[in-house]
A protein has these predicted regions:
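Cross-family detector of peptidyl-prolyl cis-trans isomerase
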Residues: 2-9, 13, 18-163
């Protein structure tokens, strides 16, 4: 009987380093349930009565300036725009406005949310979009953007230089 007890203790003791290392792994913000709930709540708080419309994949958008009439880009176009990207808490992660320099990008090379929203714009329009993680940088993230982050953008279409 003592041999069984010693064997059982040996098994438990040998597993302790594995359990300790699993518990010591830091939980990043994208792994926290409360953080994920806040990301979803930010999307749910935007209402149609406030001018928000739905696009594919749960992307929300609204026009804040302009009429939507005039030349519109397609996925094959290059676009020049000003933009500001923030997290749901308002913290800025990127802004061409801050740099005081518009950005020019091939539309097809941008995140899926932008590929859907920017073609809804005419030159001179400004929109806001709320981007669920799946339509932005996904579960892994990129640079300062953590995986699972809902992103908010203000986008102003200045030109379609590819035309």
């Amino acid at each position: 009987m003592n041999r069984k007890l010693v064997a059982a203790c040996a098994v438990v003791l040998s597993a302790l380093p594995l359990a300790a290392s699993a518990q010591e792994a830091p939980a990043g913000p994208s792994q926290d349930a409360g953080w994920h709930n806040a990301q979803q709540a930010a999307l749910a708080s935007r209402q149609a009565s406030d001018g928000w419309g739905w696009l594919e994949g749960g992307v929300l958008w609204r026009r804040v300036a302009g009429s939507g009439t005039g030349p519109r880009p397609t996925l094959d176009d290059t676009v020049t725009l000003h933009y500001a990207g923030t997290f749901i808490d308002g913290a800025d992660f990127d802004s061409s406005y801050r740099r005081n320099e518009p950005a020019t990008f091939p539309l097809r090379g941008l995140i899926r949310a932008w590929q859907l929203a920017v073609p809804m714009m005419a030159v001179g329009d400004t929109i806001e979009i709320a981007v669920p993680a799946a339509m932005g940088y996904g579960p892994v993230g990129r640079g300062p953007i953590p995986g699972g982050a809902t992103l908010l953008f203000k986008i102003e279409l200045l030109a379609i230089p590819s035309r």
